[in-house]
Amino acid sequence: MAAETKVQVSDPEAEFLNSKQETGYEWELFKENVRPLKRGRNVGILNHALKSHSDHQLRKNLIEKRRNLIEAIDEYEGDDPLSPWIECIKWVQEAFPPGGECSGLLVIYEQCVRKFWHSERYKDDLRYLKVWLEYAEHCADAEVIYKFLEVNEIGKTHAVYYIAYALHIEFKNKVKTANEIFNLGISRDAKPVEKLNDAYKKFMVRTMRRSNTADEEPKENNDLPSRSFGTLLSRGDNNARRQALGSSNPQAKKLKPNQSSKTPFAIYADAVSDTTSGNQPESDKSRPEFGSWLMLGGRAERNKENNSLPRKWASFKVPQKPIVRTVAAASASTFEVFVDEEECTEEEEEKKKNDETISSSSNVLPLNGGREIKKETELLRQNPLRHFPPNSFLR
């Protein structure tokens, strides 16, 4: 009877993961792992994507869908080659809510911007500029991307470029440079003008508030006495402080009026230290306990502990047992590493599909969630322009 009873799962998240039903509230259990989007998210796609955390088949379907979108980019023959890239980026953002290395989003960003960076058609396209800005948000230092856009005159007519660039520079405490970037966008009449002017006014308010705070801090500190280790107050400060203490201390009134703070005081003399010095009486010099202090000796006598001659340390040998090493003992300690054949076959199939996609596509890197994409993502995060030609930085 006890064997037939089922153990009730108290954790609601574990209970949901063990179940196969779709409640429509999957995002409630994984919302701390969802990267927010400015345009919002589709709840249906979000729930389906989060369900793939517990369903291996759903995850394989997502990877297969991503592969199809990448192939569609290479096979596109329409008038707007940027549109399949935008569609793929939006789908990856929805289907892989946490983002991360396995999503391949950073690699898609890099290949999209590298595909059209020299195209005159898309230099002023707002969609293309937003891909650049989203790519910059995922990198360790976005300043190199903003400088690249400035050199190649990409997005210079849009206010969102100057706002993002200036806010990034302001975050690095380069207020003067950020102000110059705002003024550059205003002088170029970047659109929309109202958005740029509003962002610049907010920037000036933050700058003035920061300068006022810096000016008020020294005034507040001047009212307090500055005390630090190893420093002494001046004589005037000491006298003023004594007078202030004397006016509030009732015992100070009992002092004589002619008594001054500069009255000399007697120095305490230790009788024992006087006997050890040369001022001791003649009767004490004859005592035997003081003879060692009077006879200091020469330099060789005082430094005899530092002048010992070197000696051999190998005069005594510790007996040791010989160590016998046999080949049989070494071979017996080895063990076989377990290999999952089913997992290896799946990886071989994905690698075969990957190779087929590589042969059919020369512009898009196939993404299968392997180690290569994780490594490439980390390299791009540190150096986002690593695949760009050197002449792309020249004006």
Swiss-Prot record:
Keywords: Cell cycle, Centromere, Chromosome, Cytoplasm, Cytoskeleton, Kinetochore, Nucleus. A motif (KEN box 1) lies at residues 219-221. GO terms for biological process: mitotic spindle assembly checkpoint signaling. It is found in: Chromosome; Cytoplasm; Nucleus; Chromosome, Centromere, Kinetochore. Its main location: nucleus. One of its GO terms (cellular component) is kinetochore microtubule. Signal peptide: none annotated. Residues 69-224 form the BUB1 N-terminal domain. A motif (KEN box 2) lies at residues 304-306. Residues 59-206 are annotated as: Necessary for kinetochore localization. Induction: Cell cycle regulated expression with a distinct expression peak at the G2/M boundary. Residues 245-263 have a biased composition (Polar residues). Expressed in actively dividing tissues, early in organ development, in young leaves, lateral root primordia and root meristems. Residues 210-263, 342-395 are annotated as: Disordered. It holds the Pfam family Mad3_BUB1_I. InterPro entries: Bub1/Mad3, Mad3/Bub1_I. A motif (Nuclear localization signal) lies at residues 118-125. The keyword Cytoplasm applies. Interacts with anaphase-promoting complex/cyclosome (APC/C). Part of the mitotic checkpoint complex (MCC); interacts with CDC20-1 and CDC20-2. Interacts with MAD2 at chromocenters and with BUB3.1. Essential component of the mitotic checkpoint. Required for normal mitosis progression. The mitotic checkpoint delays anaphase until all chromosomes are properly attached to the mitotic spindle. One of its checkpoint functions may be to inhibit the activity of the anaphase-promoting complex/cyclosome (APC/C) by blocking the binding of CDC20 to APC/C. The KEN box is required for its ubiquitination and degradation. BUB1 N-terminal domain directs kinetochore localization and binding to BUB3. This is Mitotic spindle checkpoint protein BUBR1. It comes from Arabidopsis thaliana.
